[in-house]
């Protein structure tokens, strides 16, 4: 179903792959992009379970917006193994204004399609989504 405010639809693959990340942990991360020609949010890249946070950040284009989810594993102060699913809205300062507006107007609707997101992060440059920030937001 298309989003009335931005006219964007969400490809079923987005929801299916997110469910696999959440339930089966088949992926470490998923990068999504808006395909303007077809007015739809689609899966751009799937990160394998052995890929790192650096692998994830390197696949975000420096001049284009993206949405992403990252499954972050960590150990608490009580020595418990935990995991949190981050939703990251990547909107670099150098991206086109139209693109930033499109991603901003579609974000909430798209996020609602992904049931199970625990932490949301918005970043306009890599420093705003450093590993230190991810760790701080996870706890």
Curated annotation (Swiss-Prot):
Belongs to the actin-binding proteins ADF family. Keywords: Actin-binding. GO terms for molecular function: actin binding. CDD domains: ADF_cofilin_like (cd11286). The lineage of its organism: Eukaryota, Viridiplantae, Streptophyta, Embryophyta, Tracheophyta. Gene3D superfamilies: Severin. This is Actin-depolymerizing factor. GO terms for biological process: actin filament depolymerization. It comes from Lilium longiflorum (Trumpet lily). It comes from the Eukaryota. InterPro entries: ADF-H, ADF-H/Gelsolin-like_dom_sf, ADF/Cofilin.
């Amino acid at each position: 179903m298309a989003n009335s405010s931005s006219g964007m639809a969400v490809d079923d693959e987005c929801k299916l792959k997110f469910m696999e990340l959440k339930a089966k942990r088949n992926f470490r991360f998923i990068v999504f992009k808006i395909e303007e020609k077809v007015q739809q949010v689609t899966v751009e890249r799937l990160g394998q379970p052995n890929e790192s946070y650096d692998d994830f950040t390197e696949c975000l284009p420096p001049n284009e917006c993206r949405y992403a989810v990252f499954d972050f594993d960590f150990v608490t102060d009580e020595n418990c193994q935990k995991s949190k699913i981050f939703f990251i809205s990547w909107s670099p300062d150098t991206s086109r204004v139209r693109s930033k507006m499109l991603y901003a107007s579609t974000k909430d609707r798209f996020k609602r399609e992904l049931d199970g997101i625990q932490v949301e992060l918005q970043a306009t440059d890599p420093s705003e989504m450093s590993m230190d920030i991810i760790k701080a937001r996870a706890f």
